[in-house]
Amino acid sequence: MIVSFNGDHGSGKSTTAKKVAHTLNYPRFYMGQMFRDMAKERNMTVDEFDRICKADASLDKKVDDYILKLAKENKDFIIESRTAWHFIPKSLKIYLKVDEREAAERVFKETDNENRKNESKNYNSEDEILESLKKRKKNDDERYLKHYGLDIRKESNYDLVLDTTNLSIEEVFNKVMEFINSKIEK
């Protein structure tokens, strides 16, 4: 089974995907890291690189090709990506959403995380992060609509949509696993 995760920044999708991959003993592929690495190679923040990608679809094409290759070569895995649900239609598609203010609080708490070092400029407050998240969300929405004609937040694109705003990571994980297990049993 292939499980694809998408969701709002700060929704807990990476943490949940890691836990699901560990529980199912599936490999996990994280396209966000690929994106961060591409930004780092260009000495850019994720915000800066995101703006470049909006104008240049060839950068997204590298990620798309990799997603298609993964689906062709692997039977069971977890993938985090804005577009995996589209490129792997047979996947179990999960979207995690979160209130913007809660997302900013979560991301601010993670700013010391090594993985987020080039996420954006050094922000000093949740309000600054909130503004950055709003810009990234708008940029993502416009980018995927422009390059693919996709509304990446349209809930009908997904098999499970879960609002994580008032849930602990354990509660999110349990709800996601309950859903996945219900599909495995069929």
Regions found by a protein language model. Give the residues of each.
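Post-Walker A helix-loop "phosphate-sensing" segment adjacent to the P-loop in P-loop NTPases
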Residues: 22-29
